[in-house]
C-alpha cells in the first residue's frame, strides 16, 4: 500500500487537511433539526425537505448565473442548513432566508468587485421582498449562527483529498481522476438535505471513493484508503454514505430528477437592467451535466 506522500507540497496539503479535520465539527447544521425537517409533512405551514431542496437548487442556479465559485455555493448551503436546523422557518419566508445566506456567502468569499447589488440580486431572483427585508434577515441569520459565517465544507475536503491523491500518482496518471466531475457530483448531493447530516470529510471521500471504484484504479484506491485512515473515517460510515451518494447520482442523471435551471433567470433581466449590471453578472451558463468518465 502506498503511503501518504511526503513531498513539500503534500506536507502543506496534509497540514491544511489536519486543520480542516480539527475544525469540521464546528459550524455545522444540527442533525436533530435536520431530522425534524425530513419528518415534516408538506402542509404548506412547515418547512420540509422538499422545500429545502428546491431552495438549494435555486441557490445553485444563482451561483451558475453569476459565475461564483463552488465554495461560495457550499458556504451558502451550510449557512442555510445551520439556520433551518435551529429555527422554525415558515415556507413563505424561505426565499428571503435562502437569499440572505447566499448573499452572506458571496460577500464573505467573492471579490468585492463581483458582489452584486442587493437590488439586482432580489430582482434576478424574482422575489418581491425589499432590500430592507433582506438586510433584516441577514442580521437574524448572523445572530442565529453566532456571527460565524466561515465554516468547513465538503468542497474544501474534496479539493484537498483530490490534490493529495494527485500527489500520490505518477505524473502521467494524474488525469485519471476528473475534478470537474467530482465537483458536479458534490453539487448534486448538496441538493439533498440528507447529505447535510454527513460530516463534510465523509461526504467528500464518499464521492471520491465511489468514483475510484468505477475507475478500477489500484493506486487511487490505495491512496483513498490512506486518506480514510488519516481522516479516521469509519469504514461502515464510508460505505453507508457511498451507497446514498450512488443512489443520489443515479436519480440525478435520470429524467425524474428536477435539476437547477439557470435559463429561467435570464428572461427576467430587462434590457435596461442588463445594461446597468456589470458585464460579469450577465454571463448565462447552463448547468453542466456530470462529465463522463474518461476510459
Swiss-Prot record:
Taxonomic lineage of the native organism: Eukaryota, Metazoa, Chordata, Craniata, Vertebrata
One GO cellular component term noted in the UniProt record for this chain: nucleus
Homology family: Belongs to the cyclin family. Cyclin G subfamily.
UniProt organism field: Sus scrofa
Chief place of localization: nucleus
Protein name, per record: Cyclin-G1
Pfam families: Cyclin_N (PF00134)
Subcellular localization, as worded in the UniProt entry: Nucleus
Keyword Cell cycle attributed: yes
Assigned keywords, A-Z: Cell cycle, Cell division, Cyclin, Mitosis, Nucleus
Function field: May play a role in growth regulation. Is associated with G2/M phase arrest in response to DNA damage. May be an intermediate by which p53 mediates its role as an inhibitor of cellular proliferation.
One annotated GO biological process: cell division
Keyword Cell cycle found: yes
Amino acid at each position: 500500500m502506498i503511503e501518504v506522500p511526503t513531498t513539500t507540497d503534500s506536507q502543506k496539503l496534509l497540514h491544511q487537511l489536519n486543520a480542516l479535520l480539527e475544525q469540521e465539527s464546528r459550524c455545522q447544521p444540527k442533525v436533530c433539526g435536520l431530522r425534524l425537517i425530513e419528518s415534516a409533512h408538506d402542509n404548506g405551514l412547515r418547512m420540509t425537505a422538499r422545500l429545502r431542496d428546491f431552495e438549494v437548487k435555486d441557490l445553485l442556479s444563482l451561483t451558475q448565473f453569476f459565475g461564483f465559485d463552488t465554495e461560495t455555493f457550499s458556504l451558502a448551503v451550510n449557512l442555510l442548513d445551520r439556520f433551518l436546523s435551529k429555527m422554525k422557518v415558515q415556507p413563505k419566508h424561505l426565499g428571503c432566508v435562502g437569499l440572505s445566506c447566499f448573499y452572506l456567502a458571496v460577500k464573505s468569499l467573492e471579490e468585492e468587485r463581483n458582489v452584486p447589488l442587493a437590488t439586482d440580486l432580489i430582482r434576478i431572483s424574482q422575489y418581491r421582498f425589499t432590500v430592507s427585508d433582506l438586510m433584516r434577515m441577514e442580521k437574524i441569520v448572523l445572530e442565529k449562527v453566532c456571527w460565524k459565517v466561515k465554516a468547513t465544507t465538503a468542497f474544501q475536503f474534496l479539493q484537498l483529498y483530490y490534490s493529495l491523491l494527485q500527489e500520490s500518482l505518477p505524473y502521467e496518471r494524474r488525469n485519471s481522476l476528473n475534478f470537474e466531475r467530482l465537483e458536479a457530483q458534490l453539487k448534486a448531493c448538496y441538493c439533498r438535505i440528507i447529505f447535510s447530516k454527513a460530516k463534510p470529510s465523509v461526504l467528500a471521500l464518499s464521492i471520491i471513493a465511489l468514483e475510484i471504484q468505477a475507475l478500477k484504479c489500484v493506486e487511487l484506491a490505495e491512496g483513498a484508503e490512506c486518506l480514510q485512515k488519516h481522516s479516521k473515517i469509519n469504514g461502515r460510515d464510508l460505505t453507508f454514505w457511498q451507497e446514498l451518494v450512488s443512489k443520489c447520482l443515479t436519480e440525478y442523471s435520470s429524467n425524474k430528477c428536477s435539476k437547477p435551471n439557470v435559463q429561467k433567470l435570464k428572461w427576467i433581466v430587462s434590457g435596461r437592467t442588463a445594461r446597468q449590471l456589470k458585464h460579469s453578472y450577465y454571463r448565462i451558463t447552463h448547468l453542466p451535466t456530470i462529465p463522463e468518465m474518461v476510459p
